[in-house]
Design a protein with these regions (language model features):
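Conserved pre-ATP/AMP-binding loop-to-beta segment of ANL
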Residues: 39, 156, 173-195, 202, ...
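Structural core segment of the AMP-binding/adenylate-forming
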Residues: 73-74, 101-170
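AMP-binding/adenylate-forming catalytic core of the ANL superfamily
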Residues: 113, 130, 453, 458-459, ...
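Conserved ATP-binding/catalytic segment of the ANL
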Residues: 424, 428, 437-444, 448-503
Length: 637
């Protein structure tokens, strides 16, 4: 069974409005077009950068052309690969697009990545030159003389240039007044080399062509179509495929993109009031947790009022979904009829809250006009989805991988099936196959997710054997994810094949959905399940300390206020394990082997300690390594 894109009238109209992108020969060709039509509209704004900058589309196009001429002057040729190790900023964009305009590709990574990873990328992509964010990155690399000699130049985007590096302003001055030589390659030329997140093993280089990226810039119009000048926020790492494609798309619409950071996001949301933003689930979890923290400071009577309004709105929206058959599981005619009645009964209070309460809350949470909150990089926990839907923020969950540029599916505003990752993008096909024999499966049958489309890479950089493992002769890419197709063509993910926990009984457990159920608890900040080759599952839990201490006290268990760095009081752990198993038992389709034999409290997983990727995915192997002694104790080893 294969599911492919079936265009609606809305999507056809949106693609037609965005047809200029489909006609572009290369990604970098979009800037003269934008300068000609939207030259005076603000394009990029970086208020928090080391050098705050703001350019309109005319100025941005001019700087990109100047950078391209400068790169050519310093020896960059068609087909070269230049490493770019820096974070989000207008200068990153100018360097990136200047390299493309000069005919080169960039191999990108964040400035804060481990030095060993940066050195590996520099060597693996055979970079002929290097662009770094600042002197610190260049010094940390500490390249040996023979590797330095292979680089034609080192360009520094910020600060006083270090020894052996060139400063940004001097670099641009070297290209001023020169006409950049146009690139020889077209759509099939490599535009960039991205590296997989490396949650396990060495990262692999993924060469993406201009055609791959242009497909994203065009097809995302099926999901969102903001008007020229509309404000958007960029908060995710620009060197990640998801933010990269989203940024290109929003800018190709003529939007004004403000660069923010996780630290500044709370202030920038009400200030910028974005129409659209590319996000990850962890961001929405943090926003919802912040709401809960603020709610606890209110008088009890006001807390009860808000919680009652929230529960009613969540129930009303769920009833509407059920009536419209927008659920993962099919709903009978009788069930849809009952849902219509429930939605009608709850409508008056929901309408009142939607007039008096939720607009104020939306302004505080997202700025008040976020029409396209696109979430990718992982599944959204059901309780997070339900909360934001209740207050009037419809999360548009998408799915993709670095190897697919990345978006292959996304929920549409008019077809938003909660629990799914949406419908295929234009010209994209899905197939679900049996994990054991590779035979195609039917609707609602779970198996490995295969995808084919114009956004899929041709293969890993210099790794033909690894490429052959994931790409077949017909162009089908094995995502490594597990999922199923719904009758309307939507794809729903159920887990990651390599994350599957196989118990000693031979039963396969997908930890993702179980972990989503557990983090719905106000007691749990983060969780990772373990149990490979064991009789039962176990849980590594990062607690919400204040909430868990108060909860334990109500149950008659006295624990220390500071829970950090300790496995936990035995009485507390037994209590917490029972609570976890209660939550797991409540899951739809819950199985008896999806229960925990024990839990331990662990320190947080973060980007800083290397246990989360830059897109906030757990590095399960590293977490296991850090907490191996606690896991051994959990199983009595």
């Amino acid at each position: 069974m294969t599911a492919s894109w079936s265009p609606t009238t809305r999507e056809t109209d949106a693609l037609q409005r965005h047809a200029h992108v489909q006609r572009l020969p290369r990604v970098d060709a979009v800037w003269p077009w934008l300068a000609d039509r939207h030259g005076l509209i603000a394009a990029v704004d970086a208020p928090h950068a080391a050098h705050p900058e703001r350019f309109n589309f005319g100025e941005l196009a001019e700087r990109i052309a100047t950078a391209a001429a400068a790169f050519r002057r310093h020896g960059v040729n068609d087909g070269d690969v230049v490493a770019l190790f820096a974070e989000n900023s207008p200068r990153w964009l100018v360097a990136d697009q200047g390299l493309m305009r000069a005919g080169a590709a960039d191999a990108v990574r964040g400035a804060s990545a481990p030095v060993e990873e940066l050195r590996y990328i520099l060597s693996d992509c055979r970079a002929t030159a290097l662009v770094v964010q600042n002197a610190d990155v260049w010094r940390r690399l500490a390249l040996p003389p023979e590797q330095r000699a292979q680089l034609r130049f080192v360009l520094q985007l910020e600060g006083e240039p270090a020894e052996g590096a060139m400063g940004w302003e001097a670099f641009l001055a070297s290209g001023a007044g020169l006409d950049p030589v146009g690139p020889a390659g077209g759509r099939d030329a490599v535009a960039t080399v991205l590296y997989t997140s490396g949650t396990t093993g060495q990262p692999k280089g993924v060469p993406l062509t201009h055609a791959n990226l242009l497909h994203q810039m065009s097809s995302l119009a099926c999901v969102a179509y903001p008007e020229p000048g509309a404000p958007v926020l960029s908060v995710l790492p620009i060197w990640h495929a998801y933010e990269r494609s989203a940024s290109y798309f929003f800018l190709s619409c003529g939007c004004t993109q403000t660069y923010t950071t996780i630290k500044q996001l709370k202030k920038d949301l009400p200030r910028v009031r974005p129409i659209a933003m590319a996000t990850v689930p962890r961001l929405w979890e943090a926003v919802q947790a912040g709401f809960e923290d603020v709610l606890k400071t209110f008088p009890p009577s006001r807390q009860r009022l808000l919680r009652a309004a929230l529960a009613n709105s969540a129930a009303q929206r769920k009833a509407v979904r059920t009536a419209r058959n927008l659920l993962l599981e099919p709903v009978s005619a009788a069930g849809r009829l009952r849902a219509c009645g429930s939605a009608a009964l709850r409508w008056p209070l929901h309408a009142l809250a939607s007039t008096l309460i939720w607009p104020k809350l939306r302004r505080q949470l997202s700025g008040g006009q976020l029409a396209y909150p696109i979430s990718g990089g992982g599944a959204i926990a059901p309780h997070i989805d339900a909360f934001f839907e209740a207050v009037g923020i419809e999360l548009l969950v998408g799915y993709g991988l670095t190897e697919t540029s990345p978006v292959v599916s996304c929920r549409r505003p008019w077809r938003n099936i909660r629990g799914s990752s949406g419908l295929p993008m234009p010209q994209t096909e899905f197939r679900i196959v049996d994990p054991d024999n590779g035979q195609p499966l039917g609707f609602r049958q779970r198996g490995r997710v295969m995808v084919r489309g114009p956004q899929v890479m041709a293969g890993y950089l210099g790794k033909p054997e690894a490429s052959a493992k994931v790409l077949d002769a017909a162009g089908w890419f094995d995502t490594g994810d597990l999922g199923m197709l719904l009758p309307d063509g939507s794809v729903a993910l159920t887990g990651r094949a390599k994350d599957t926990i196989v118990l000693s009984s031979g039963e396969n457990i997908e930890p993702g959905p179980l972990e989503e159920a557990l983090v719905a608890s106000p007691l749990i900040e983060q969780v990772m399940l373990v149990g490979q080759d064991e009789r039962q599952l176990g849980g590594l839990i990062v607690p919400r300390a204040e909430a868990i201490v108060a909860w334990a006290a109500e149950a008659g268990v006295s624990v220390a206020q500071d829970l950090g760095g300790q496995p936990g009081d035995p009485a507390l752990l037994r209590l917490l394990m029972r609570e976890c198993n209660r939550l797991l038992k409540q899951r739809s389709g819950s199985r008896g082997d999806e229960r925990l034999a024990g839990v331990v409290l662990v320190d947080p997983f973060s980007i800083e300690n290397g246990l989360l990727t830059q897109t906030l995915k757990q590095r399960r192997d590293r977490i296991t390594s850090r907490d191996q002694q606690l896991i051994d104790g959990l199983y009595g080893r």
